[in-house]
Design a protein with these regions (language model features):
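Helix-to-loop junctions at the C-terminal end of transmembrane segments
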Residues: 84-97, 182
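Structural signature of the two symmetry-related core transmembrane helices
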Residues: 99-114
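Juxtamembrane intracellular "pre-TM" segments in multi-pass secondary transporters
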Residues: 8-41, 221-227
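A membrane-interface helix-boundary motif in multi-pass transporters
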Residues: 180-198
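A late C-terminal transmembrane helix in Major Facilitator Superfamily
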Residues: 156-183
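Helix-loop boundary and gating motifs at the non-cytosolic
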Residues: 35-74
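C-terminal membrane-cytosol helix-exit motif in multi-pass small-molecule transporters
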Residues: 1-14, 201-209
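Intracellular juxtamembrane helix-capping segments at the cytosolic ends
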Residues: 138-151
Length: 227
């Protein structure tokens, strides 16, 4: 089929009718909409949380005397927790995006901060961080929805490119945050700093619409999702 389409008489490739969209031209529109900024911030903090978990948990495990295999086992267990995401999705759909996002950030904030307080009991601290991975997975499910549901349909292509910049920003913010924390605190302090950022996002998520993402039935029986 591929060769027929490429070598046949049909037009497999057509000339573009207009210039390619320029995401930079939409930065002004992005900064003018607080809902987009909040949604993008949620994505950055979620990615930062995974960076802290994946990079610093194995290092901390070795320094805490848990051995050099615990880090790898923790990553494997965190990956296995992805099988719980269908249950998380069902839980979220029965409530609202706002409630799910706030629950994710609050749970991550508490568990990461608790891991710092339990640093002298490494196994308990590790269990707290693994619980934090569950909340990060919940944010993987719902954390991007506030941004995507706030974007106008006519701007989705350009704003998708703006949204994807969260990966690059978190890749800069995460090591910079760790560097600042390690100047004045032990390695476990990185988890506390991440928990503090999650707490800030929990407060910010309180400004989302209470019924964001909640399905409602119209007079004609149609199901509409609140944006």
């Amino acid at each position: 089929v591929f060769w027929v389409m490429r070598l046949g008489n049909g037009k497999a490739i057509a000339r573009a009718r207009r210039p390619a969209p320029n995401p930079m031209a939409y930065l002004g529109r992005f900064f003018a909409q607080p809902r987009l900024i909040s949604g993008w911030t949620f994505a950055v903090m979620r990615s930062t949380g995974w960076y802290v978990f994946v990079v610093f948990l194995p290092i901390w495990a070795v320094k805490a005397g848990l051995g050099d295999k615990i880090g790898g086992l923790s990553m494997s267990l965190a990956s296995a927790l992805m099988f719980t995401t269908p249950l998380m999705l069902r839980w979220m759909q029965a409530r609202s995006v706002r409630r799910a996002v706030r629950a994710g950030f609050l749970g991550a904030a508490v568990t990461f901060a608790l891991a710092t307080l339990l640093a002298d009991a490494p196994w308990l601290a590790l269990a707290s961080l693994m619980a934090g991975a569950l909340f990060l997975l919940l944010l993987d499910i719902c954390g991007g929805l506030p941004f995507l549901m706030a974007v106008k349909p006519s701007e989705r292509t350009e704003m998708a490119a703006v949204y994807s910049s969260y990966r690059d920003v978190s890749g800069i913010v995460s090591p910079a945050l760790a560097w600042l924390v390690l100047l004045a605190a032990p390695l476990s302090g990185v988890f506390a700093a991440a928990g503090l950022l999650f707490g800030g996002c929990w407060v910010l998520a309180g400004r989302l619409h209470p019924r964001l993402g909640v399905a409602r039935v119209t007079a004609r029986g149609a199901v509409v999702v609140k944006e």
